[in-house]
Amino acid sequence: LDKYPIKMKTDFNHCESLYWVFTQLCNDQCDHCYNLSGPKGARISEEECMAIIENMPDRVDRLILSGGEPLADRKLLYAILDRLRDRYAERTQIMLQTNGDLLTEPILATLIEKGVSRFDIASIDRYHKHAGARLEVLAELFEAHGVRGDHKDPLIDKDSYLIENELSWGYWGATEDMWLGGNWARGMALEKGIWKRDPQHNFCTILSGARNFLGGYDDIPQEISIQLWRINPCCPGTKFPIGDARTERVADVLERVSRHPVFKKLNEGDPWRMGEHLGISEAEARKRTEVLQNVCLYCDAFFEENMQDLNRERFIELPVLQ
């Protein structure tokens, strides 16, 4: 866990990688989906999305738009791309994560015109409807528009998380050999019982986990996640979000939690030590995880028992007394 440690960053108005699920609407409904996306998936308004963009850090190296299926909410996607271009111009690389089912020649041309420079086809697995059946068609489509396929793998390393001066695409899916190592205990995967049962597997210490969400490591990019409006230190999300991107500046939220002992440990990718300041030893945490069979489920239990101050649903607005 101490591999490549450096001093934690202090400029939270700069984010190397921001992963934003702006919609959970999807044309598919996969058994492994971690956020319950589908034809009736949750959505937020264009007004809320514009507020979220306004509250993003002033500097973002790359911004990954995902879902759901972004192309299933195309009008909103286009509005988001236009606003992102107004705010960041060419200073930010815009990347789109899609299952590729709805991608056509006119849509691809529009996406490129609106500033998308990286396309990730994240559906090459047994869970998706087409499971890569369109891959050859998509390859021809990308080639016709000058989108290079030299960088097929997901961009997860610090030295390759950006691709300079070219359009590119890649493809991958929820397979056992992907960098995550299995399905998070979230959403449909949790309901269907196909989440990874391995108490030793630390989702937290790899990209898409919480490690480096506040900076401090130079082997993976510093990345945060926004699930609709919920600001999270990781893609699967903590039990309670660390902030609301509709009403709070992301930089302020990160600066606030950077002083908290729980989030310092999560930033180190070490969830089993996040309760030490409360008298919960690493040995106790690991023993609890053995029972729960998954580190994300241990994290959920810890937050439920010790982090209720972040639970936005517990606040009840009381009537004003006259």
Q: Each PLM stretch: what is its role?
A:
Residues 111, 116-127:
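Non-cysteine beta-strand/loop elements that form the S-adenosyl-L-methionine
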Residues 147-205, 236-291:
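C-terminal accessory region of radical SAM enzymes
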Residues 26, 30-33, 234-235, 293-299:
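Short cysteine clusters
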Residues 85, 89-99, 127-163:
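Short acidic, glycine/proline-enriched helix-loop-strand junctions
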Residues 32, 36-39, 135, 241, ...:
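Secreted/processed peptides and extracellular or luminal domains of membrane proteins
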Residues 210-231, 247-322:
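Auxiliary Fe-S-binding modules of radical SAM enzymes
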Residues 1-98, 102-114:
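Conserved alpha-helical substructure of the radical SAM core
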